[in-house]
Amino acid sequence: MHTFAIVVHATSAIAAFIIGIVFIFQSNTLRQLQLGRAIVVLLMLMEVFLVIAILSHVTSLPTITQIIFGGLVILGGYMIWRAVQAVTVLTKQQQENQLKVIDHVGFVLISLFDGFAIVSALDLQAPGWLVAVIAVGAVGVGIFGINVRKKTLKMQTI
């Protein structure tokens, strides 16, 4: 059960990331709304299967790992909330709110990207300091990318 849950969790996260990238570069609001809803569903699947994966072996995990996984569950819930906020803003169809939508989806993308980077570093048995550097670096790269996209959108509306 644990392996299946991890596979579905990871597949949902990867799909949400890919759709999120497509979303960021989509200019059609209706298409963004459809993609946004898909992101919400995929994040919900990601979260449910994360919880299943954790619960399937929680008693064998060290306390610190249980705390970290608890934090990841909270982060996943917040990511879902941000994706729902993006969909809510899109349903109002006000062009001036486009930057808010990019902020919400951008947060989700940065969180997913950071998760991929951290898991990869951990799987490669990188030392803790390197995992921390990778995590901070991934956030920095993500913020830079989202800000570039927002600047492009601002220039298009002028």
Language-model segment annotations:
Residues 1-158:
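Alpha-helical membrane insertion/targeting regions
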